[in-house]
Amino acid sequence: MIYNEYSNNIAKRIGHYTQLPDGWAVAPMQMLCSLIDGEKQNGIERINLDVKYLRGERDAKTLTSGKYVAANSLLILVNGENSGEVFRTPIDGYQGSTFKLLSINYDMNTEYVLQVINLHRTILRENKVGSAIPHLNKKLFKAIEVPIPPYKEQQRIVEAANKVFMSLDVIMGSL
């Protein structure tokens, strides 16, 4: 369960279903994915996949050692104001120091898990830990209770959510 600063069960307060459809389960996020580091490498020149580069705010800088991350990997920001933000790496490179590699279990739809993480971004952002530099509250992240439908239903949910987001983009563009 996820609790807010008043020790109220947030899931209960926002009305999450207590009865799930047949074939569904609930599991904490830590059962669905893990936050790890890339494999350490030395002597190979690669791009530093830091947050400014991944946002397109800075040109690539190269390093000759670091924690290797393959192209199309998922990096989650664990330090700073936007902790919980997830990036997909465009190329092979070295993991930026403010990131962890987000490793999602093979039996979960990656986009479904990313939708769940995105759903909880505000809670994660508002409940950071650390005084000098805010950090992702990993305990809170790992404890997020995730409703898990069968895989095909995960795909259907992602497709439906994407259609809604596309419609919202059209509406926002016309305002």
Task: Label every model-predicted segment.
Residues 4, 8-39, 50-54, 147-175:
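Non-catalytic DNA-recognition/assembly elements of restriction-modification systems
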Residues 20, 62-63, 130:
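Short, solvent-exposed loop/turn positions at domain surfaces
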Residues 28-34, 39, 87-92, 100-148:
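Basic, amphipathic alpha-helical recognition segments used for DNA target recognition
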Residues 52-59, 65-118:
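A short beta-sheet element
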Residues 80, 138-141, 162:
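ATP/adenylate-binding site constellation spanning eukaryotic-like Ser/Thr protein kinases
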